[in-house]
Amino acid sequence: MLTYIFKRVLYTLPIMLGVTLVCFALVHLAPGDPLVSVLPPDASQAMKQQMMTLYGFDRPYYEQFARWLWRAAHGDLGASIASSRPVVSEVSRAVGNTLILASVATMIGFALGTLFGFVAGYFRDTFIDKLASFISVIGVSVPHYWLGMVLVIIFAATLGWLPPTGAGPGGSGKWGLDWEHVRHLILPAVTMSVIPMGIIARTVRALVAETLSQEFVAGLRAKGLSERGIFRHIVKNTAPTALAVMGIQLGYLLGGSILIETVFSWPGTGFLLNAAIFQRDLPLLQGTILVLALFFVLLNLAVDVLQTALDPRIQRS
């Protein structure tokens, strides 16, 4: 097991290096002036050149990348052009809020998706199967930003049960474990959970249906094993894949939360990315993308290790 983990870590290192290169290239090759958020419209050419030198934008791309990679390896992602605050502090605060939102959304999606998937797979080719499958298809198909706006109109604007935006009372940018903060979390978390719910439901449904059609299940029933015992065998066979899908969905939610966080003004990485894009804040933009990409790579590594621990056949293969 330790040898397998060591190999997976070694495989991850070149992936991380490639992620940093792609992140740097995408940000720096995009059109636009990186100093548009700090320079006045009537700024002189001398002032522009001075700012370009200050932020190192006048250097060759390979030199900029080498300096940025060296500093990033030491925990320094530079300073935001728009706010002059360290990128690390900006991103760390936003990542914490996004982790809370994505984790809660993934747990909701996993719970509902597993329930719908098991029910649909166990009662396959029945009305219950068709209903659960229809719900999962709706979850995958509905645009979550549209669903978020619909939920805001119903539960915030019309009924007034839940707050429409923010992470806490008074526009607080920091989340806390109390009822007011939980109320702010409900709408974005439910909205974000719809896609993982649909994907997990379809995956679990296929796994359960496949397991029930295997010969060993018929043999267990012939031996008189109860349905509860058969259910335990089904869980054992579907758990590794279901957990892997859940981990991947958590990674996707971490990186794909920009629309949800913008709709609900949730102060996470998606909201931060949106602001950095419009302000053309290159240090903040590439720092945020890098942190999210590394989170996704490390999360996939953790999922691989967990899946191998649950199913040793993966390691042997």
Question: Language-model features: where?
Answer:
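An internal, D/E-rich "acidic patch" concept
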Residues: 58-114
